[in-house]
Every structure is written in C-alpha cells, then in structure tokens.
C-alpha cells in the first residue's frame, strides 16, 4: 500500500485531513482522541463524557466519520462515556492495513478495538445507517460483550434496499456536487430539505461538502454491502435492542420494517420517528436523544 493510502495522493491526504480537522473543531463538547492499534489497522476514536460513565460506542453511517454524531453528542455524553469511532474502512482518520472483505472482518475489527480500549463486557453499541447494520452484525457475532444494542435507520438489516438505490448510488458517485446533492442527499434527507430555513440549508451544504471531500480524496475501495438479517438471526438476539426509523425512511418502508420485527422478533423494541426519514438524528434530534437515553437508562446498574 502506498504511504498515502487510503487517499489518492499525498496532496489528497493533506487536503482531506485539513478539512476533517477544521470540521472537528465544531464538536460541541470536550473530547480527547486516540489512535488505537488493532490487527486490522489504526482506528481513530473521539471520546467524550465522564470518565466513570458506562461505555457507549457510536458507529457512523457510510461515507461519513465520527463527526456525523455532532447533533447528538452533547446529550449522549452527559451521562455516558461516549466513543465515537471513525470506521476503519471509510472516511475519517482510521486506516486499515489488512483487507476488509466481509461483515466478519468488520465485527472482528470492532472486537479488537473494544479490547484495546478496555471496554469490558457491558458495552452499549449504537450505529446509524451502515453503522446500524454493523451494530446488528456485532450483536449477532459477539453478544456477550454487549449490554444494549441500538439500530438507528440501519441500512438493509430488516428490509432489502429499494430498486432505485443502485442507480442513485451510481449517479452520486460522479464527482460533482450536483449529482451527490440531487440524487442522494436530497432524496435521503428530504425532511431536512423541506425545512428550507437558514440552518437547514447550511447543514445540507455541509453534508454535501463532507461527502464530496471524501469522494474526491479517497481511492476506491470495494464496499461492504449491508445484508438483511434472516428470521432466525433476528430471533436469536437476546440482549436488549432498540430499532428506530423515521416514518419517511427512503431505504425501506418504515411500517413494514416495524411489522416484520414485531412479528418475527417482538423482543426487539421498535419506534417510528414522526416527520423524519434517514435524517432522523438531524431533524428530530431531541426526540431521538430522548428515546435513546430512556432506553439506555432503563435498568441501568448505576440508576
């Protein structure tokens, strides 16, 4: 691998990391960072919250980094020791040194990371979109390490991607703002777009900036495609699990996803977030935070 991997060049690496560090200055609470060695490479972790708080690990969506949690981190880190992770096989400051081929590699990487961070066997794990799917996979593979599992609008996991996902993904990979914004972000984040106020417009532009910076600076890596869990897999989950989805979710019909879980795996708690889609953590931040914290604090040993 070249010295500048996973970037396209030394210049691209410098450009992206400068942009990333500038965006990171907007993190709204005190944090410290660690670059953690694992058998799959170096993982960058942003840590916030009380040092004696129960561990809460956050996994980002695809084509994003730990910074995707900026809207929610203030509330989450008030009581929990929050570890916001840069996916080792996506954008951010993490760098894989071993090939990542499938979900097992991803969950083994996470297990290495949790051991290196000395998080013990009572971890709260939460993921958004791709991170939600990865959370479900870790829940299946390493349930004894988890206390609670939270899936926020998980990609696939419950329902297959819609047919339009493929062509939207192809068009949004064209390195121009118009295609990324028009065919992917404005579609996924339609509720944010509809707000059309100054802060929402600014946030949408930042999301486009983030995506384009990664697209322009990173070399192509074969993506890991999220899968749909089988009935048996969903039924096998015994630890306390929460599934949150926006009523206007574009990746799958929210009501049908909830119906499947309620029928096949009623032990998984489900909630539909009103007036939100895949942007639920952005347009309904307070409601999502409230539901997540209520779920986490229920039967918390520190309560």
Residue map of PLM features:
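Alpha/beta-hydrolase fold catalytic core
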Residues: 1-56, 79-80, 297-303
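Short beta-strand/loop motif that positions the catalytic acidic residue
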Residues: 237, 243-245
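Flexible "cap/lid" loop of the alpha/beta hydrolase fold
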Residues: 140, 148-176
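Catalytic histidine-centered segment of alpha/beta-hydrolase-like enzymes
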Residues: 276-285, 289
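Active-site loop/oxyanion-hole signature of alpha/beta-hydrolase fold enzymes
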Residues: 84-126, 290
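Acidic catalytic loop of the alpha/beta-hydrolase fold
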Residues: 248-252
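Conserved HGGG/HGGXW glycine-rich cap/lid loop of the alpha/beta-hydrolase fold
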Residues: 41-92
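Conserved alpha/beta-hydrolase catalytic His-Asp/Glu region
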Residues: 157-162, 178-235
């Amino acid at each position: 691998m070249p010295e500048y991997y996973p970037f396209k060049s030394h210049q691209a690496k410098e450009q992206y990391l400068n942009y990333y560090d500038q965006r990171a200055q907007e993190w709204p609470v005190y944090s410290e960072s660690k670059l953690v060695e694992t058998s799959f490479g170096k993982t960058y972790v942003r840590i916030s919250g009380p040092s004696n708080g129960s561990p809460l690990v956050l996994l980002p969506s695809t084509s994003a980094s730990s910074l995707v949690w900026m809207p929610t981190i203030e509330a989450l880190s008030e009581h929990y020791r929050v570890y916001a992770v840069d996916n080792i096989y996506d954008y951010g400051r993490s760098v894989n040194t071993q090939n990542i081929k499938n979900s097992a590699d991803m969950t083994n990487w996470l297990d290495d990371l949790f051991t290196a961070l000395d998080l013990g066997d009572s971890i709260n794990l939460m993921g958004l979109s791709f991170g939600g799917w990865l959370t479900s996979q870790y829940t299946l593979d390493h349930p004894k390490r988890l206390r609670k599992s939270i899936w926020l609008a998980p990609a696939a996991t419950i329902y297959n991607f819609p047919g339009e996902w493929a062509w939207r993904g192809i068009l949004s990979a064209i390195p121009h703002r118009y295609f990324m914004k028009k065919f992917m972000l404005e579609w996924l984040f339609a509720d944010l777009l509809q707000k059309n106020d100054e802060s929402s417009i600014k946030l949408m532009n930042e999301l486009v900036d983030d995506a384009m910076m990664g697209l322009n600076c990173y070399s192509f890596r074969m993506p890991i495609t999220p899968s749909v869990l089988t009935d048996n897999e969903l039924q096998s989950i015994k630890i306390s699990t929460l599934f949150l989805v926006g009523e206007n979710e574009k990746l799958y019909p929210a009501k049908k996803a909830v119906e499947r879980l309620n029928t096949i795996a009623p032990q998984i708690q489900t909630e539909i977030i009103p007036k939100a889609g895949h942007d639920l953590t952005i347009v309904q931040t307070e409601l999502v935070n409230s539901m997540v914290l209520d779920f986490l604090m229920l039967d918390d040993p520190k309560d």
